């Protein structure tokens, strides 16, 4: 089985980060747990670097622009994110789940993954991790989390 940064991130998110913040262990304990779970130290370190970059790039808390410019995707972004993924990001932004800065952070973190292409499910996990890390995004995170685990996602009203 090919491990990826996303595999490590999903394992961390499902087993540690979704718990109470006080229960999150130090990096050495997390790394030991990941090694015991079968992940390679190389992928673990890449995942920690990904998380460090996410934490360092928190957008400032500001009012979201209602009618901002349309995002034009560049070649590498078009290669990694198919039409469905790009449409999903537009949907989230138009419905106030993501603002433009958060969308850019999601794109940055998606592009930092070691995968040639992301499917919609992978992108949804990236969005969820970004929202989890954003102060003031609790409602958007809760909505996104609900959508992740529903058979038929609810439309926004």
From Swiss-Prot:
It comes from Stenotrophomonas maltophilia (strain K279a). Belongs to the Smg family. This is Protein Smg homolog. Pfam families: DUF494 (PF04361). InterPro entries: Smg. The lineage of its organism: Bacteria, Pseudomonadati, Pseudomonadota, Gammaproteobacteria, Lysobacterales.
């Amino acid at each position: 089985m090919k491990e990826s940064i996303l595999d490590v991130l999903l394992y961390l998110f499902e087993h540690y980060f979704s718990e109470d913040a006080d229960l999150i262990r130090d990096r050495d304990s997390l790394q030991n747990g990941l090694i015991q779970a079968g992940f390679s130290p190389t992928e673990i370190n890449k995942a920690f670097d990904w998380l460090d970059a996410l934490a360092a790039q928190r957008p400032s808390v500001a009012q979201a622009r209602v009618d901002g410019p349309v995002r034009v995707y560049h070649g590498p972004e078009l290669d990694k994110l198919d039409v469905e993924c790009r449409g999903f990001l537009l949907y989230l932004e138009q419905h106030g789940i993501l603002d433009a800065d958060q969308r850019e952070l999601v794109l940055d973190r998606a592009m930092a993954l070691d995968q040639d292409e992301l499917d919609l499910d992978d992108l949804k996990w990236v969005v969820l991790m970004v929202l989890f890390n954003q102060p003031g995004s609790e409602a958007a995170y809760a909505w996104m989390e609900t959508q992740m685990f529903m058979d038929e996602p609810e439309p926004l009203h």
